């Protein structure tokens, strides 16, 4: 009797002519996707490639999709611009990026009650709201308006927001794995947004970068 042995599937990087055209950024050790090229800054076992997503990517104009779940908030805002630029330059025309990141509106609505100053829960609430900003390696939390403007300023087109797991693009549906909290006053616990590469040039928005420097980064770097 002949025994059939299943050969392991060969995985080619996006640089290869037959390579995978879907890249997941910041996947960590547990969110590995079979049909995606899984990347992280750290060389975890079973990921496809360790890479700094804020540095130039080696796959210009090749990718169908880029996906990053709860990754953007771990970057300083200037690093986030670098990441979005490099992802956009790596997408082919019509390719899409999908991001999920905590909603700063939801954090403010759910973490502090604005009761009288002597309210007994204020100690815990104050700790919790700071935890949302600084815990788990967080560097920056986004409002819907800022996230939309940032994507558009970098050069993405057709910027849209979606509910958890939903998309107009079949290949981008059902990707989210992080738990989602209840919406409060219309604000979800995380913003899930997509943008497409189109005719608008992808690049670093000088005016927005100057705003970030003036209103935030200069003060963060100044220390006391």
Predicted regions and their residues:
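Membrane-proximal basic amphipathic "stem/tether" segments
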Residues: 1-19, 213-224
């Amino acid at each position: 009797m002949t025994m059939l042995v299943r050969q392991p599937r060969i995985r080619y990087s996006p640089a290869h002519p037959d390579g995978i055209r879907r890249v997941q950024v910041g996947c960590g050790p547990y969110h590995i996707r079979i049909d995606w090229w899984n990347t992280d800054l750290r060389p975890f076992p079973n990921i496809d490639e360790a890479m700094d997503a804020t540095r130039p990517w080696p796959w210009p104009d090749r990718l169908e999709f880029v996906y990053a779940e709860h990754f953007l908030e771990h970057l300083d805002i200037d690093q986030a611009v670098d990441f979005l630029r490099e992802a956009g330059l790596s997408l082919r025309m019509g390719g899409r990026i999908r991001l999920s990141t905590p909603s700063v509106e939801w954090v403010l609505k759910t973490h502090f009650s604005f009761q009288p100053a002597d309210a007994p829960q204020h100690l815990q609430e104050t700790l919790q709201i700071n935890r949302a900003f600084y815990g788990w390696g967080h560097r920056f939390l986004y409002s819907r308006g800022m996230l939309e403007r940032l994507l558009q300023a970098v050069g993405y087109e057709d910027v849209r927001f979606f509910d958890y797991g939903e998309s107009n693009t079949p290949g981008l549906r059902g990707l989210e794995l992080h738990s989602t909290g209840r919406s409060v006053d219309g604000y979800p616990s995380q913003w899930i947004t997509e943008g497409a590469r189109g005719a608008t040039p992808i690049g670093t928005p000088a005016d927005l970068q100057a705003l970030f420097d003036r209103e935030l980064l200069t003060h963060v770097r100044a220390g006391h």
